[in-house]
């Protein structure tokens, strides 16, 4: 690429779902703005946006128990409703893009897949029933079903029931209108749209450094890994959507807003089967209940995944530890991220999360046979010869300073933006990709406060519930969801 004397309007660092989503929003709002995308690998969507690296796809808080904790005997559904509202905004934007012809063939990235929760034992069944009662009362979840009848659960997901002891107490909820999303395919479609409309994509280009110019723009130093040459680009606005690579780049930027933040990398593993006979008997995303004291990322689930038109089943995740911040990162990533301003929060997190450390150690030393036993608890007929292990992506949990504890480990995502709005980045993980649209709307609101009022009308045209809740009028909620389901070719 040639260096330009004129600064580009937008530089997107990282070719994943976040950069692709933000770029598409900006291109829809400001078609004449210049956009350049820099991806360090030879393809886009090869890290956390890749479907085989992504822990939860179609995240809508329909089946994940960690979003509905029980406190003082009451099930709290606030997190679940917030995440589901966010997912509805993502669906609305995708539906707009399909209608506009910007993203063709929705079945190539989103497919109807029921979401289920499955538990064993009387106490867990009673909890699931209370959760069901609390959620079904909300307009977003009124279509949820519950059963303790093995015959009914068998009709929903046969593999959960086959060869299970007849006297075992089991229970399940099902939300038939769930989805499976291939964020790798969606990312590629969005990047294709951007490049077809003037954006420049630079693969094998790694941003190595950046500094702010006197006029407020940013100067980026970029290495072309193919020719080992260095290029330099100036940009009016920079978004760092580089997954685990976002923290080091935000640290290099020197913005004060990144002080006190650290990252805790966690790797993952799956069991996967592509056997058509097994796959045909399970069409659902089924989440279980994490063991007492285990962290949220340990929730076991048996997932239908549709990638490239082919259906597979994944079970896991099994956590592990690697100091890399990216699957194809450096073993020095964690240690290189330590700064005087974040070492106290990091030490505080280590002190207060011994159960997480214990869990990771137990996962690291667990044999393949012991890990497979966890699958058999879900699927009694599971046979090791039908399944193989695959390595998932890296997720970097946010560690941040806290006035009371010194530092806390945050399960979720966090936008870090400079006060002047010239640069922003995204830290963290779950729910991540499924809520990419509302997260990137937050970036627009924080980084372009002088423009957001003028953008409100086109944003509302693209995302009808921008600024409002889908469930604000319970009578209209089903119709709103049905409209996106029809455009995205989802059975509902």
From Swiss-Prot:
Disulfide bonds: none annotated. Pfam families: Mqo. One of its GO terms (molecular function) is 2-hydroxyglutarate dehydrogenase activity. GO terms for biological process: tricarboxylic acid cycle. It catalyses: (S)-malate + a quinone = a quinol + oxaloacetate. It comes from the Bacteria. Gene3D superfamilies: D-Amino Acid Oxidase, subunit A, domain 2 (3.30.9.10), FAD/NAD(P)-binding domain (3.50.50.60). Pathway: Carbohydrate metabolism; tricarboxylic acid cycle; oxaloacetate from (S)-malate (quinone route): step 1/1. Its cofactor is FAD. Its EC number is 1.1.5.4. Keywords: FAD, Flavoprotein, Oxidoreductase, Tricarboxylic acid cycle. PANTHER family: L-2-HYDROXYGLUTARATE DEHYDROGENASE, MITOCHONDRIAL. Belongs to the MQO family. This is Probable malate:quinone oxidoreductase. It comes from Clavibacter michiganensis subsp. michiganensis (strain NCPPB 382). The gene is mqo.
């Amino acid at each position: 690429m040639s260096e330009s004397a004129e600064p580009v309007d937008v530089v997107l660092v990282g070719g994943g779902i976040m950069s692709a989503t933000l770029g598409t929003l900006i291109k829809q709002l400001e078609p004449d703005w210049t956009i350049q995308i820099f991806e360090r690998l030879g393809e886009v969507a090869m890290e956390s946006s890749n479907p085989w690296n992504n822990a939860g796809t179609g995240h809508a808080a329909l089946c994940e128990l960690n979003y509905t904790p029980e406190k003082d005997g009451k099930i709290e559904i606030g997190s679940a409703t917030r995440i589901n509202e966010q997912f509805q905004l993502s669906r609305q934007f995708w539906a707009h893009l399909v209608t506009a012809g910007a993203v063709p063939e929705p079945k190539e990235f989103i497919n109807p897949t029921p979401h289920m929760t499955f538990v064993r034992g009387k106490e867990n069944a009673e909890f699931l029933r209370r959760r069901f009662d609390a959620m079904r009362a909300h307009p977003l979840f009124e279509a949820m079903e519950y059963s303790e009848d093995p015959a009914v659960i068998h009709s929903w997901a046969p593999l959960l029931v086959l060869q299970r002891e007849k006297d075992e107490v089991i229970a399940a909820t099902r939300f038939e209108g769930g989805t499976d999303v291939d964020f790798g395919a969606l990312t590629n479609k969005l990047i294709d749209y951007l490049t077809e409309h003037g954006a420049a994509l630079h693969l094998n280009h790694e941003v190595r450094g950046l500094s702010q110019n006197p006029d407020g723009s940013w100067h980026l130093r970029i290495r072309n890994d193919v020719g080992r040459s260095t290029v330099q680009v100036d940009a009016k606005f920079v978004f760092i959507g580089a997954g685990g690579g976002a923290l080091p780049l935000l640290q290099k930027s020197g913005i004060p807003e990144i002080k006190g933040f650290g990252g805790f990398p966690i790797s993952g593993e799956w069991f996967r089967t592509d056997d058509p006979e097994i796959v045909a008997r399970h069409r659902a995303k089924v989440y279980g209940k994490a063991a007492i004291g285990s962290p949220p990322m340990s929730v076991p689930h048996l997932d239908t995944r549709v990638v490239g038109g082919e259906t597979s089943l994944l079970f896991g995740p099994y956590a592990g530890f690697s100091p890399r911040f990216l699957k194809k990162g450096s073993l020095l990533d964690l240690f290189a991220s330590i700064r005087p301003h974040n070492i106290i929060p990091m030490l505080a997190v280590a002190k207060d999360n011994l159960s997480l450390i214990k869990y990771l150690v137990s996962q690291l030393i667990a044999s393949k046979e012991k890990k497979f036993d966890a699958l058999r608890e879900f699927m009694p007929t599971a046979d090791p010869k039908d399944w193989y292990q695959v390595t998932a992506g890296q997720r970097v949990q946010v560690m941040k300073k806290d006035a009371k504890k010194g530092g806390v480990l945050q399960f979720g995502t966090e936008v870090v933006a400079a006060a002047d709005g010239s640069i922003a980045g995204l830290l963290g993980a779950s729910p991540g990709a499924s809520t990419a649209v509302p997260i990137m709307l937050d970036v627009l609101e924080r980084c372009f406060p002088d423009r957001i009022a003028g953008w409100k009308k086109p944003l509302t045209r693209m995302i009808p519930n921008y600024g409002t809740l889908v469930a604000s009028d319970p009578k209209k909620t089903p119709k709103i969801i049905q409209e996106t389901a029809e455009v995205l070719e989802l059975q509902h």
